Curated annotation (Swiss-Prot):
Keywords: Amino-acid biosynthesis, ATP-binding, Cytoplasm, Glycosyltransferase, Histidine biosynthesis, Nucleotide-binding, Transferase. It catalyses: 1-(5-phospho-beta-D-ribosyl)-ATP + diphosphate = 5-phospho-alpha-D-ribose 1-diphosphate + ATP. Its EC number is 2.4.2.17. Belongs to the ATP phosphoribosyltransferase family. Short subfamily. This is ATP phosphoribosyltransferase. It is found in: Cytoplasm. Heteromultimer composed of HisG and HisZ subunits. GO terms for cellular component: cytoplasm. It is an enzyme of class 2 (transferase). GO terms for biological process: L-histidine biosynthetic process. Catalyzes the condensation of ATP and 5-phosphoribose 1-diphosphate to form N'-(5'-phosphoribosyl)-ATP (PR-ATP). Has a crucial role in the pathway because the rate of histidine biosynthesis seems to be controlled primarily by regulation of HisG enzymatic activity. Disulfide bonds: none annotated.
């Protein structure tokens, strides 16, 4: 049996929609009707539901054979002992720098994504101070704790409703399928079958 780690939250909703579009209702229904269970089994696949940033850890430690997570998570810690295998056609969004309309000088930036933020401003040759937050990043700009934020944007609605505007898009994000390195060989056929059931080309990058 394969164990697949799924990100809870927005990406899980996108995954369910993707399954439904591809008529994979067995998996979709099992996930939708899981109630509060953190692990479920459907069609010989065990799905475990974890925080998005923890998906690579469960895969790396061998608890899960496969993980589905956002490329944003993988960019923050790129040197994990996993196979960063293929792109998946859902979960599309982007990183953006956002600020109040009247802000002209960005020196302090709040974000959850410290590496992405530091790399971007270093490439621009801009010296900034980074404040790391784990949630509600927009609030830091709203209350003037920082000049700007770097966060994931899908529709921009949350930014606009809090009086912020996108200044620059700094990187695209999508879902990625990752595998445990040992499972990649010991369960190669099962992994290949899982990907085929998703309706995704193994060679799609």
């Amino acid at each position: 049996m394969l164990t697949v780690a799924l990100s809870k939250g927005r990406l899980l909703k996108d995954f369910i929609k993707f399954l439904e579009r591809n008529n994979n209702h067995v998996w979709a229904d099992a996930i939708i009707h899981r109630e509060r269970k953190l692990q479920i089994t459907a069609d010989s696949i065990k799905f475990i539901l974890v925080k998005g940033s923890d998906v690579p850890t469960y895969v790396e430690e061998g608890i899960a054979d496969i993980g589905i997570t956002g490329s944003d998570i993988l960019k923050e810690r790129p040197n994990r002992n996993i196979n960063n295998y293929i792109d998946l056609p859902f979960g599309e969004c982007h990183f953006s720098v956002a600020a109040k309309p009247n802000v002209t000088n960005i020196q302090r930036v709040a974000t959850t994504y410290v590496k992405t933020t530091r790399d971007y401003f270093n490439q621009k040759g801009t010296d900034i101070s980074i404040i790391q937050l784990s949630g509600s990043v927009e609030l830091a700009a709203v209350v003037d704790m920082v000049d700007a934020i770097v966060d994931i944007v899908q529709t921009g609605t949350t930014l606009k409703s809090n009086g912020l505007e996108e200044r620059e898009q700094i990187g695209e994000i999508n879902a990625r399928l990752i595998t445990n390195k040992h499972s990649f060989f010991s369960k190669s056929k099962a992994i290949e079958n899982f990907i085929q059931q998703l309706g995704v080309s193994i060679h799609a990058q």
